Every structure is written in C-alpha cells, then in structure tokens.
Amino acid sequence: MRTLKIFALAVSLLSMLAAPVQASRIKDIASVQGVRSNQLIGYGLVVGLPGTGEQTPFTDQTFRTMLGNFGINIPANERPKIDNVAAVAVHAELPAFAKPGQKIDVTVSSVGSADGLTGGTLMQTFLKGANGEVYAVAQGSLIVGGLGAEGNDGSRIVINTPTVGRIPNGGVVEREVRSGFGSSDYLTFNLHQSDFTTAKRMAETINNLVGDGTAQAVDATSVRVRAPRDLSQRVSYMSTLENLEVQQASASAKIIVNARTGTIVVGQNVELRPAAVAHGNMQVTIAENVNVDQPNPFADGETAITPQSIIDVNQEDARMFVFQPGTTLNDLVRAVNQIGAAPGDMIAVLEALKQAGALSGELIVI
C-alpha cells in the first residue's frame, strides 16, 4: 500500500512538471519579420442589380469609361439611365508567399447611393498595393448577407448591410510579393505583445535546442535567430523553431474601461493599497412643461404662454467600503457587488482610486 501511494505521488508530480504554466508555441505568440499579408484595393462596377443601383456622376463616368474600353461611345450630352449599376470599392488580403494563379477572397462595398448589391456581378477590377502596382484581378457574382426593401409610402426595412458583399475565391493573384525570407543570414521573430521577459525566454529556449549564440533578444519585441542559407533547410529549421513552447511572462496589471458600453476588464495582477471609498448615486430629472392661459371669450386679452420647469433630484445614501493592504481582484469585485454599484459607478470608483494612488495597475479608458 505504501509503495502504491509513493507511485501515485510520483505520477502526479511528473504530470505537474510536464504541463508548464502558460506555455505557448512560438508560432502563436510571434511572427517572422517580413512574412506578412498585404492589403489590396481597387475601384470597379457592379452590374445586374434589380433596380437598386445609383445615378451618381462618378458612376456615370466609370460606366462610360468601361463602355469606351469595348469600343462603345456615348455622346457627352446624353445620360443613360443605369439604375442597375453601382460603383464599388474592392479590397482583399494578399497572403504571404501567395503565388500567381492562386485565388483569394474579395470584399465589395458600395461607395455611392446604391440601395443594395444583392444579385449583382462585379466586373473585372484591378487590385493594387500601396506602391500602385497591380497584384490581383477580381471578378464574379456577389454573396450579400443583407436585405433591404422599401414601400411606396417611403417606409423602409433594412436587415444587416445590403451594400457590402463578398466573392469567395473571386480574386486571382497576378504577381508575387517578395518577402526576403531567404535573403539574409538571420531571421527575426516579433512578439505580438512586447515583453522583455518573454523575449528573453524565447531566446533561451531556442539556444537550449540549437546552441548558445543562435538566438538573441534584441529588445522587448524582437528575437534575432541565425538561420541556414539553404532554403530547404531553412524551411525545416523554421518549422522546428515555431513549434517550440515558451513560457510567457505574467501580464502587467491593467484595467480596461469602455466608458460608452460600461464594459470593465480587470487583469489578474491588479491590487489595491489601503483606501476607503464612499460613493453615492445622484439622479437629476428635469421636465419642461408649457402652461397656456386663454382669455375669456369676447374679452380684450391675449393668450399667454409660460414655461414651467420641474426639477427632481434623487440621491442614494453613500456607502463606504474599506480596502486593506494586499486587496486583490476578487476582493474588489466582491465589495463592489455587495453595494450594488452599476458599471458607471464602478468606473467612477476606479478613476478615483487611480487618482488617489491606491490602484496598483494601469487604468486604460477606451
């Protein structure tokens, strides 16, 4: 029985050692410098709309240019009715290492006064990068998740967004973007969230596998790694490195407050220094009424209109709670819930604690 207990204890200790706390793969917390997607954008026309198009000047100009490319010229003094056409902006993400001939998804958005893009087809549109070069061409039928309808009396109902659609695999890559992946003796990992401790641990993890001096933490974001020159070896090398697990550093104490929605997110390491808080909720209601005094019939008088304001003030009794040294997140939440504070009250309390120097964390209001 004693041997069985010792074996069970050993198994439990091994399981604890085999599961590092907050260990993440390098590929999940960092990216390789230069290996990224690129944004593409273009301008084009959607045709075939069921009367939900537009008659804007730039749509008319684009429509004339398109017909001119096919040898059809419209007199300048004539303006054709084209309510089945809409001018659109087309954008897409060009993935890293995308090759010519591969297909990408594109998003189409109306830039004019079109009521909807349902049932439309995007005409051939060039997608350009930030340097003005064409990297892809988009074309195809739109998939629109929104719906819009309008009655004869002007009433209208809109579900979701009918002026934005997508074309899965609607773009064809025409040009490759060079990444510089194999042009240097070094590769650099950039952490998604900068942290000196995590960068140091990443470099140590790589050095423990490959050898001392292979990886070097440059700053809180970047870790530079020596890599093989041969491309086939470099791919295998990066595949091994990106699957290494690194124990991330504990996050800094932060409190994120969204004043518009009342959302409050409190980090685990937030603590409070000794403080006492009293907060009372005051509600002020102002109502404006108008009194109309009419003169008696056949009397020589005028109607008098006098405004009347009614102001009502309701204030709850202030409640006080005390934070002792070492108060943690759980204590803070429990104390606030006990007094029944609303999100707006909680935000006011947090701001006051920060100003008083009793909050050991960064308060960020978004």
Curated annotation (Swiss-Prot):
Role according to the record: Assembles around the rod to form the L-ring and probably protects the motor/basal body from shearing forces during rotation.
Recorded family membership: Belongs to the FlgI family.
UniProt xrefs under InterPro entries: Flag_FlgI
Signal sequence range: 1-23
Subunit structure: The basal body constitutes a major portion of the flagellar organelle and consists of four rings (L,P,S, and M) mounted on a central rod.
Subcellular location: Periplasm; Bacterial flagellum basal body
HAMAP family cross-referenced by the UniProt entry: FlgI (MF_00416)
Lineage: Bacteria, Pseudomonadati, Pseudomonadota, Gammaproteobacteria, Alteromonadales
Alphabetical GO biological process terms: bacterial-type flagellum-dependent cell motility
Protein name, per record: Flagellar P-ring protein
Family annotation (Pfam families): FlgI
GO terms assigned for molecular function: structural molecule activity
Gene: flgI
Keyword Coiled coil: no
Keywords: Bacterial flagellum, Periplasm, Signal
Transmembrane segments: none
CC annotations in GO: bacterial-type flagellum basal body, distal rod, P ring; outer membrane-bounded periplasmic space
Principal location class: periplasm
